[in-house]
Amino acid sequence: MNYLNTNTPLLLFQKNLNSEIYVDKSLLIEKISKYINTGDCYICITRPRRFGKTINATMLGSYYTKGYESHKLFHNLSIAGTKMYEKHLNQHNVIYIDFSRMPDFCNSYCDYITNILSGLKEDLLEYYPHLKKKEYTSLSQMLKETTDTFIFILDEWDSIFYKKFVTIDDKTDYILLLKELLKDQPYVELAYMTGVLPIAKYSSGSELNMFHEYNFMNDCIYEEFFGFNEDEVKNLCLKHNSVNYEDLQKWYDGYYLSNGTHLFNPRSVHAALRDGVCLNYWTETGPMNEIADCIEHNVDEVRDDIVKMVAGIPVEVELNGYSAAELELNTRDEILSAMVVYGFLSYYDGYLRIPNHELMEKYQKVLSRDSFGEVKEIVDRSKEMLEATLAEDEHKVATILEAVHDREIPFLKYNDENALSCVITLCYLYARKDYVIEREEKSGKGYCDYIFIPKKKGQTAIILELKVGHSSEEALQQIKDKNYTQKVEHCNEILLVGINYDKKKHHECKIERITNRE
């Protein structure tokens, strides 16, 4: 069998169960099952790649299929403890299609879709021999003729849209094919579909409007089943002590459930625990490049928003999702919305943020692109800025800051503390290679503006305090009075950096080195 009651989802789900790092999401089955054979049987869940869509799709396919006995896969999972566990276990015909799978030597949409349709027709003819007595003009006719009902598990339904050989007409044909196959068909018990971007990205009207769609911005029903929450990650850390929770949180946290609970990137957490080290496991570069191209045009100040978020400043915005029209990356809201859907930004309580250190590294590369003009030029001098700071060259640090100010880039004008923070972030961007830079972190008796925590033992830590209209000496004194050095007192050397901006004197800098004797 190719798609009908195939053992493919069972084999794939078994592999995940065999993994030492597995989080039980089986209660999703209970949520989905109540919509079988109802008017609400069309469910589409869109999430960024790496957020567990395929694992859950294989789990559902394994549970529902009547092609194989799968109790052994589920008897130790949470779903086995529910009252409905046996009601749908191995009771349904399941058509499981992973649309990201391509046939060999596939060079056109025709090759792609013919392979899927031929495989499914082959399955139906084998499973229902009486269908061989008649010719059919469509797959839906064959399915009706079986007089059976089916659960459709359609994983990565939108993957074909990323292929270069697909034309606009091909996309239209594909949407109409899905409509004919699924919409208002008596043989559909359940249609569970997953993808990356919302249906509205591809469908201009009512073709697939039977689906109830749940994405990163509007899902308060299934959100707990995609990604790892705080408790799940803490439990994984107890079982696998290769990486501590705090490091995982810094690298891969930063998304939110509707109730404010934190959500982690599951694939990256898995990889870090498996390898015993936190690294950048984000591999999805295509959409990031597409969005970076849009940012470069500075559409409605999107580029300015990105610089602010790199500086750790949340950006206030109203995002309404994609329920109305096809997504075009032309406006600020459209670009920022797409970045949330792709997982490049997190959105909660009206504010956008760069979720974590893993993605921060990606944005730093975006800011270094040639087309960012003056922003790139500032970033290019950030190595020089770090070297001047470590060399205690107060004059050079002040001179570099003065040069940035003299450029008169609109969103870097010193009309508030956030603008000054953006300048500092850009000027010290290179330092992120060697330091974890924390902004407004609790240390000692208060909150300091910036702490540069060395990634390697033996490096010099940096405490940076900003002042506007005061003096750099006052900034240094505040670091001492508030004991901001407490968080990095384990370091042998600490640089205290006080920076002041005054409309008359402009920039001044004072640097003092503290050596901790062991």
Task: For the regions a language model picked out, list residue spans one by one.
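Conserved catalytic cores of phosphodiester-cleaving nucleases, focusing on short active-site segments
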Residues: 424, 448-452, 460-468, 482
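Active-site metal-binding core of divalent-cation-utilizing nuclease and nuclease-like domains
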Residues: 142-147, 432-457
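Mg2+/Mn2+-dependent nuclease catalytic core
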Residues: 171-176, 468-486
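A short, contiguous, amphipathic alpha-helix enriched in charged residues
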Residues: 121-122, 421-431, 483
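Domain-level recognition of nuclease-like catalytic cores that cleave nucleotide substrates
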Residues: 487, 492-518
